[in-house]
Amino acid sequence: MEGPEIKFAEAVLDNGKYGTRTVRFEAGRLAQQAQGAVAAYLDEDTMLLSATSVGKHPKDNFDFFPLTIDVEERSYAAGKIPGSFFRREGRPSTEAILVCRLIDRPLRPSFITGLRNEVQVVITVLSIAPDEFYDSLAINAASASSMLSGIPFSGPIAGVRLALIGDQWVVFPKHSQLKEAVFDITVAGRVVTDSEGNEDVAIMMVEAEATEGAWDLIQGGATKPDEAIVAQGLEAAKPFIQQLVAAQASLAQQAAKPTVDYPVFLPYAQETYDAVSALALDELGTVYQTADKIERQDADDALKTRTKEAVAAKVEAGELPQSALTEFSAAYKSVTKTVVRGRILRDGVRMDGRGLADIRPLDAEVQVIPRVHGSAIFQRGETQILGVTTLNMLKMEQQIDSLSPITKKRYLHHYNFPPYSTGETGRVGSPKRREIGHGFLAERALVPVLPSREDFPYAIRQVSEALGSNGSTSMGSVCASTLSLLNAGVPLRAPVAGIAMGLVSDTVDGQVRYAALTDILGAEDALGDMDFKVAGTSEFVTAIQLDTKLDGIPTSVLDGALKQAKEARTAILGVLNQAIDGPDEMAPTAPRVISVNIPVDKIGELIGPKGKTINAIQDETGADISIEEDGTVYIGAVDGPSADAARAQVNAIANPTNPEVGESFLGTVVKIATFGAFVSLLPGKDGLLHISEVRKLAGGKRVENVEDVLGVGQKILVEITKIDDRGKLSLAPVLEETADQEGRDAASHGSEAPAEG
């Protein structure tokens, strides 16, 4: 039996010294009953199947386009059996949900306006190489299958992920390559042609972040991902997008079905719009100059009711068709949009009276909830976010069972959007896709500035509660997270703030004019063309998310919006720094976590037979102990004394020569520094005799140079005064008179306890 004819097209993307990546699209063999189906390959080992299906009958009672994107991660794709009780895949992973949103954002505006037939795009991960991402490949697969489906679709849409490694943007990077990268960006766009026939790529979606290791790389001299570098990344994506668009177009020429003339339900007829405009246009201009959200909504609701009654009267009188009643809401919204956008483009004034680049009033406060480990409130206008931080041992970090090589995550950000935040009623409970997406965006914004596991061995859960919403609660969550984390004592490398930018565009005198808006309101988001969220430190960008309702946005416009966002971010960081300018002391209710390094061959001895030894230590001290494969032991307890007691017992078993606070040693000076001297106590155990302690050896006189008092190789009697959480030793000199006095005291008291010093 002869098999089906397979049509294919491919694009070979050149990464220079990093080699090439081949993206291949095939059609004709798999999912033959779907309206459009494409198998997409990244090199040889990663394979996705995208199937686009369309309902036979329109949902004419819907006033929106019923598009559903589903990503199905199959465990067999990575050679795994699911870890659930029934050993089969369950609900989508967080990664799958985020990829669904990533695909939906550029695809949705590409279908014909007014389509009411249900459209479903299902992307199934059939095979994935261990070190690969599949998200940007999925954007291309979904676009390609939609191109073949016969649905009116203004594609192709292409998506690429790029990583900035050194001074090169590498397309379709691998997980392991991100360790060398400072910035990671995913861009989706389409190819557009201007009136002179010149081709360019219009950007439709951006998702980007600084990598987890970006801070250390930047400190080591790597390129800092500021606004100019991000703009370069958008430009670097264009040629790769053009190649992938060309490959999809080639496949569509071979295998696309004829475009079907599906019924299109336009939101309103022109006569309905004209009637609503005549009745409401002037009053809308007044309503949308009201700064207060609730007052504006009340005035708008009253005007809308009066206008609808007037339209109903015209229908009853035969002046308008019956359909005008069902078209009224869409027409009213369109007139509102015309009023708001016209004032912005014409006068440079927004509905609450602000200029294009003005920020609403800001307020920030920390330590607002008792007993929690860290808390803060950040307010921008009517948007109010409560941030709450919880710390625990690293064994409480999230364990991840997905197709990604990442198996655990110690920083979690969870975002909640209750209905009362907008003064409404609604369902509460498990998070929706939007909440998961917003939480992940705010999480990515903070990851680059978190302290390392070694410096801060805690699992961190950050929760953002949207208590009030009128524009960009996700960027408000970034600001609240910075405040709350610092209040909890987390030593962030730098504070992070976020701002949401909007865009209004229209054709004026034959030219498309754009106006970028800083700190958009909820209504400006709904009535505008773009939602562009930018988070970062004072020095570089840490996270970006772009959505647009247009066919695409020129990179020059995005470059200008990035620069405008930097000014706003700098102003917000000033407010955050006034509220808290560094990490606070950890709350008394927070656990204390310290670390001890033991020889790997001592791990078994510390655990004991069937865990007997480690369990006994935990029971006796009340501490929790976890052991890493490299011999790092994390000890967590409700207070410092319990943690210290557990550390002493661990050292007694695994590091019997480890010194303790209060012990005296005759040490040897091994190194002189400007701030003190390093003294060797035992093999591999050095401590610092700070210059303030060296003064005691000089009779309390000021010491300008440590070399004037001590020299390398000199013997000195010292006492351990402190062991910090990383095992570093602080020393003090034991003076002769002190030692003699202690000896006399001990002799006079005999067997009694020694006198207090």
Curated annotation (Swiss-Prot):
GO terms for biological process: mRNA catabolic process; RNA processing. Coiled coil: none annotated. Pfam families: KH_1 (PF00013), PNPase (PF03726), RNase_PH (PF01138), RNase_PH_C (PF03725), S1 (PF00575). Its cofactor is Mg(2+). GO terms for molecular function: 3'-5'-RNA exonuclease activity; magnesium ion binding; polyribonucleotide nucleotidyltransferase activity; RNA binding. GO terms for cellular component: cytosol. Residues 662-734 form the S1 motif domain. Residues 737-757 are annotated as: Disordered. The keyword Nucleotidyltransferase applies. Keywords: Cytoplasm, Magnesium, Metal-binding, Nucleotidyltransferase, RNA-binding, Transferase. It comes from the Bacteria. Its main location: cytoplasm. Residues 591-650 form the KH domain. The keyword tRNA-binding does not apply. It is found in: Cytoplasm. InterPro entries: ExoRNase_PH_dom1, ExoRNase_PH_dom2, ExoRNase_PH_dom2_sf, GPSI/PNP, KH_dom, KH_dom_type_1, KH_dom_type_1_sf, NA-bd_OB-fold. Mg(2+) binds at residues 525, 531. Its EC number is 2.7.7.8. NCBIfam families: polynuc_phos (TIGR03591), pppGpp_PNP (TIGR02696), PRK11824.1 (NF008805). Involved in mRNA degradation. Catalyzes the phosphorolysis of single-stranded polyribonucleotides processively in the 3'- to 5'-direction. Belongs to the polyribonucleotide nucleotidyltransferase family. HAMAP family: PNPase. This is Polyribonucleotide nucleotidyltransferase. The gene is pnp.
